[in-house]
Design a protein with these regions (language model features):
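Intrinsic-disorder/low-complexity, polar/charged segments enriched in Ser/Thr/Lys/Arg/Asp/Glu/Gln
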Residues: 1-5, 58-60
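C-terminal structural segments of small proteins and small subunits
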Residues: 50-82
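Compact, glycine-rich, soluble single-domain proteins
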Residues: 5-41, 46, 50-51
């Protein structure tokens, strides 16, 4: 299992949720997003929306599986715009 904490950037808007799900869905690993003790499957649009992510909050990305390390890096890059 791999984890990475990031701060949700100002540019992350609800319209980016579909792109986030598409990015997460490229991996076979289970990817979860954790915000303020709420956890959601990163491959679920409704799950991500339920997190109600806001600029400046701490987000923990958790991945388990064969490609977990690459999934964490890719998800981090999605949020940081790298």
């Amino acid at each position: 299992m791999f984890e990475k904490e990031i701060t949700i950037p100002a540019f992350f808007e609800p319209s980016a949720v579909a792109m986030l799900v598409q990015t997460a869905s490229k991996f076979s690993s289970r990817i979860s997003l954790v915000v303020e003790e709420k956890t959601a499957n990163a491959k679920s649009i409704m799950g991500i929306i339920s997190l109600n992510m806001q600029e400046g909050q701490t987000l923990t990305i958790v991945a388990e599986g064969d490609d977990a390390q690459m999934a964490i890096l890719t998800m981090e890059n999605f949020f940081t715009g790298v």
